[in-house]
Amino acid sequence: MEIITHPYSWITLARLAILILTAFLAWMTYQSNLLLKRFQPDFNLLLSPLETIVRVILVGVCLLLAWLTGLPAAQLGLSMVNPLSSIGLGLAVGIVIQVVVNLLTLEAINFFGRHIYSTQVIRNILPGRPLEWLLVPLALLPAVAMEELLFRTLWLGAFRDIIPLPLLIIGTSLIFGLMHLPQGSLGVVIAAGVNILLSLLFLWTGGILVPLVAHYTVNLLQVIVAHFQRDWLEEY
């Protein structure tokens, strides 16, 4: 019992669980990539009730693991300071990131060819009916929250004491990028770059709110931009 109640044992267990959770999500991403190559679903994956339930559960698991570490809320980025200004900063940064990402994506496709990017994911989650314009933004919330809690709160917060930050940021960015493999090699590279920026935002602001809002803004704007490029996507 003494071993179980020792604080260092709890944080070790939490770190092990974070590794297992990340490996599981990476495996699921790989399986999704294989599935999308063989099968194009005729329903919006983002709006699948089962997918949404799983994402909400994963958010809860991330919060549980954060608590299990026993680390201060400030180190995990879970203490809220000036939330309104943080939301405003996150929105501004998210808009800038999305503009840059959109330009880089188009330039890279024109230069390297269409084989470097897959439009399957974005075409699948595009709202097809007016009601889906309400549901898709809502469904993005747990998806973004789960990724931010995992890569910012858990990885940067719980491992920064034992892994040098530059190595931690690069390593998590590679994992984050590979989790976007269904979007093609370009999607992997861009996602890894965005993860580096979000990690720096987390460390600079000391909280998860700014990178979370920025991440959500990027994803939502990506859907909006794709809506106006629907014909191009269908012909891709």
Regions found by a protein language model. Name each.
Residues 124-125, 138-142, 157-164, 178-187:
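Short, amphipathic, aromatic/basic-enriched membrane-interface segments that mark the entry/exit
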Residues 64-77, 142-158:
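Alpha-helical transmembrane segments and their membrane-interface junctions
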Residues 24-31, 166-179, 184-236:
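Functionally important transmembrane alpha-helices
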Residues 1-88, 167, 223-236:
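N-terminal, membrane-interfacial amphipathic/helix-forming hydrophobic leader that caps
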Residues 41-47, 71-143, 161, 232-236:
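Juxtamembrane helix-loop-helix connectors linking adjacent transmembrane helices
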